[in-house]
Amino acid sequence: MARTARVKKTGNGTSYYHIMSRANDRRFLFGKGRVKTQLVDALKRAAAFSGIELDAYVALDNHFHVVCKVVRTDEPVAEDELLRRVAILKGDRAAEELAAHWRELCEIGMEAAVAEEQGRLRARMNDISEFMKTFKELFNVWYKRERKYTGTIWSGRFNSTLIEGDRYRATCMRYVYLNPVRAGMVKRASDYAWSWIAAPDEPFAGSVPEWRLMRRVAQIGGGKIFGSEVFVVSMVFALGDRFRSRSVCARAVGELGYATHGWRLARAETAAQGPA
């Protein structure tokens, strides 16, 4: 079966995503606190390297969630910044060795080779797929060495949902943060050691009681686009070719108490059924 195209906003500007990835066969590979601590650390380091801003995250026993912000511009990442990010990801020594390597290449007239290497690094920035690839490579090395594990850690590709800003972003952030409460692991989200939520940029527009977010909402966790109908339609139009061969099903998210839509790729006969 052909893989479904990942929904990602292209071009310059700001976009937000909800990302979720599970352990292989839903096994409790991350059950120990030390493993979850390392998972969170790898998320932070991979995000800093990739230029991704974390809005919320939670590490659970067999999966994790992230809400993140991606800002894309025409301004290339400067060499000093590239080295700073490499230091975050791989350590100061690795960054120092890379800087020395680039200097040596420049001294023998191989500036083009330096530009090519830096270009490959820049291509890994500000992209959720590259962010997840960097994170999983980093975490996998530690996990397999620490746990003497030889099997597959992750269950296929990660799931991602493109989300609108403002209240939709805030809803996803709170939904992610409440995961340990929904799972019965703690009574208050703030008591869970492996989750975090950023303070909102501005007051939350349109209150959503937390008890509503205690219900699992498929459009947040499994949809492809989450936001107002205007946002969803505009994104579907902008993404164009990815949707022409498929139908798009709109489902109203009534549990959240205000008008919003979660859209996902669906079969034609499913799309004809209307809101669920």
For each feature predicted by the language model, list its residue ranges:
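Short Pro-Cys-Gly-centered "Cys-loop" motif that presents a nucleophilic cysteine in a tight turn
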Residues: 1-61, 69-276
